[in-house]
């Protein structure tokens, strides 16, 4: 055996086995980015008494996993690693598969993935899926593939165990995405690209120089054009930067990544390359330049910078306000197979933000009722959006209170009228409620008191 698993990895593995023992044939294992899920499924494949098919969604991940199997001295005589698209086109070329492992299972197209899983299930194979964020972009359920789910540690626990590093979160500016259209669960790329003005590039470069000039950073951009522009802006500022995307030739990509690992390149800008499982060492800072409505994508991007190293603290510079949509990297999240994740609440019940940004040092922190920034200790002034929501809440409370008071007044009036025993009682009721003496006279006469 080439791999020694950690306690939490063994617990996840045991949990999956327990579900299989109950009769489930398809189990989804959830483990936060950086939790070492690839080591878990490599151990599974190594122990399988039959042929194992490992499915990935990109050829780069296939090559990476094959390399990891070899590096850990795991024989691959009965292990096949292939993209789900390739397997879908020639499913009959893979006979006698006993176990199917699906890495980054939430990223597979539902129809293609289901066809592949159903094919091998008919042959008697069982399926184990792995994901750090089991929610598809379009919000659709994953219960069409998996019948049960086993959860491993979340980000906060892995930070506590020193398996992920702590972080500092800065939000020097944000962008207004309220008017952006969505397509398949996320903002339309062309609209996001138009939103990202050159002024934002200048600000992120200034903040990088101020906060983490010695750290190597990865920048997540919204398009190839955007990524290239950001790399050019960093280079013009005297900071070695390079752009990568899925179309970058393999040899060129390997050369640039080697230069990054060697410290020759300080900033790697990319589009969807390092946010989907592909790993790269040496990242000390994450630059968020792509607003996203996808929690899964946001978690993957944050996770690239949280790989553990002694004394490392990752710097996250969020220039697009993703924290306001998705919270902080180590927030606890409730996952279900239905793809529904409890949405991050921007406001507390009192109208204040659940996550605040200090306007002085730009640090982002959880709102625990502090009157000042826990980092720079400047007094925290309520944001205009907080004040607006607080005012709306107060107006609602006033309205509700007025309605309740009026209902109580009417109930008391009804009771007083019922208990009136003489004309004088009606004149007293009129006085208390601001009614005229004519009202009292009429009521008393109706009762026969006058």
Label every model-predicted segment.
Residues 107-169:
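Post-DEXD/H (motif II) to motif III coupling segment of the RecA-like Helicase ATP-binding lobe
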Residues 106, 246-250, 257-332:
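Conserved RecA-like P-loop NTPase helicase motor core
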Residues 57-61, 82-89, 110, 222-225, ...:
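Conserved helicase motor
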